[in-house]
C-alpha cells in the first residue's frame, strides 16, 4: 500500500513539474516574442530614420548642385552676352 502511495506521489510531482515547466516555457516564449517585437520596431524606426536622413541629404545635395549649375550657366550666358555686346559696339 505504501508503495502505491509513493508511486502516486511521484506521478503527482511529475505532473506538477511538467505543468510548471510548460508554464515557464510559455512565459519565456511571451518574453522572447515581446523582445523580438520591440527589436523589430526599433530596427524599423532606425532604418526609416536613416532613409529619411539620406533622402534629406540627397535633396540638399541636389538643390546645391542645381543652384551651382544654374549660377554657372547664368554667369556663362551673361559673360557671352556681354562679349557679344562689346563686339557689336
Swiss-Prot record:
InterPro entries noted in UniProt: FAM25
Domain of life assignment: Eukaryota
Family in the record: Belongs to the FAM25 family.
Name listed for the protein in its UniProt record: Protein FAM25A
Protein species of origin: Mus musculus (Mouse)
Amino acid at each position: 500500500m505504501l508503495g502505491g502511495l509513493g508511486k502516486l506521489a511521484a506521478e503527482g510531482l511529475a505532473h506538477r513539474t511538467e505543468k510548471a515547466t510548460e508554464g515557464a516555457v510559455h512565459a519565456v516564449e511571451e518574453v522572447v516574442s515581446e523582445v523580438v517585437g520591440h527589436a523589430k520596431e526599433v530596427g524599423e524606426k532606425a532604418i526609416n530614420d536613416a532613409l529619411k536622413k539620406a533622402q534629406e541629404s540627397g535633396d540638399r545635395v541636389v538643390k546645391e548642385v542645381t543652384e551651382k549649375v544654374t549660377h554657372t550657366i547664368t554667369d556663362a550666358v551673361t559673360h557671352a552676352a556681354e562679349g557679344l555686346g562689346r563686339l557689336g559696339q
